[in-house]
Design a protein with these regions (language model features):
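Detector for outer-membrane/organellar transmembrane beta-barrel domains
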Residues: 28-188, 195-201, 205
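Outer-membrane beta-barrel biogenesis signature
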Residues: 207-218, 229
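Outer membrane beta-barrel
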Residues: 1-41, 196-200, 221-226
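Conserved active-site loop/cleft motifs that coordinate metal ions or position small ligands
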Residues: 178-180, 213-222
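Short proline/glycine-enriched turn/loop segments at secondary-structure junctions
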Residues: 135-137, 191, 209-210, 238-243
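Tryptophan-centered motif/residue detector
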Residues: 157, 171, 226, 255-256
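Low-complexity, intrinsically disordered Gly/Pro/Thr-rich segments
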Residues: 230-239
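Outer-membrane beta-barrel "beta-signal"
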Residues: 201, 212-213, 240-256
Length: 256
């Protein structure tokens, strides 16, 4: 169990910096059917107040932001040391001040405040698998489904579906061929409805025959295309008037 406080110095009221307080409780490594289980629960409160002109990014009005609260919870199922890898399935749901959770727990940032923060909602489900049946091949598929409603989505339900796969073939102890292909579809009523597809090929040098062996040095080539709805929204300035793109380069990846 933990108490976590987060504040935004760029947003102020007569009460000081806008702050959110969380009480977070978690229980992991529960042995059960088909593997290990975990659960978490978070309760969050944000004290509102009168925002002075310009204190809220993107707003020029004096706004009285109401105090809000909310809860979030999650359920995780894992199977470790499974076919040379692991399996993790996670479902999370949050409301109001606790709706901006990320990863396996609570959010550590405060979103732009609005009069409708109490109506914010988020549902997120992810399935992540790593398989390495031999020392010559490994593969990692992932699936994600999210529905979200908040200030950034104009209080409409935004839906995001994403899935992809990354195989890796080990040619020697230090040389391997890897890559990935993925697909995303995003829908926000009245704003956009579109998709993006991407594939990457990358020969790389690493320390061993393990999928997560690091550090690695890789050369990569990537091709992506996306629907016309996303023209100007994907790829930044170099691809702002296009619906496809190609890029390449060198990349070093290291963890600690």
């Amino acid at each position: 169990m933990a108490f976590i406080g987060v504040a935004r110095p760029d947003v102020t009221t007569q009460n000081g910096n806008l702050a959110t307080s969380h009480i977070d409780a978690r229980v992991y490594d529960i042995n059960g059917p088909l593997g290990s289980w975990g659960v978490w629960f978070d309760y969050a409160t944000t004290k509102g107040g009168q925002m002075t002109a310009g204190s809220v990014p993107g707003s020029s009005d004096v706004t009285n932001i109401p105090s809000t609260s909310g809860y979030a919870y999650g359920i995780r199922h894992q199977r470790l040391e499974w076919h040379g890898g692991y399996h993790t399935f996670l479902i999370q749901y949050g409301t109001g001040a606790a709706s901006n959770f990320s990863g396996p727990g609570i959010g550590t940032t405060i979103p732009t405040p609005s009069l409708d923060t109490a109506r914010s909602r988020q549902f997120l489900a992810t399935e992540q698998i790593v398989l390495q049946p031999t020392d010559k091949f490994a593969v990692m598929p992932i699936v994600l489904f999210q529905r979200m409603r908040n200030f950034n989505t104009q209080n409409q339900w935004q839906q995001w579906i994403s899935f992809g796969v990354r195989p890796q073939v080990f040619l020697t102890k230090h040389l391997s061929l890897t890559g990935d292909c993925g697909f995303d579809h995003t829908n926000l009523p009245g704003a956009y409805d579109g998709w993006l597809r991407k594939c990457t090929f990358a020969p790389q040098i690493g320390p061993d025959r393990k999928f997560f062996g690091r550090p690695v040095l890789r050369a990569f080539v990537t091709y992506a295309n996306w629907s016309r709805t996303f023209r100007g929204l994907v790829g930044g300035v170099p691809f702002q008037n296009q619906t496809s793109g190609f890029t390449y380069g060198l990349q070093v990846e290291h963890w600690w």
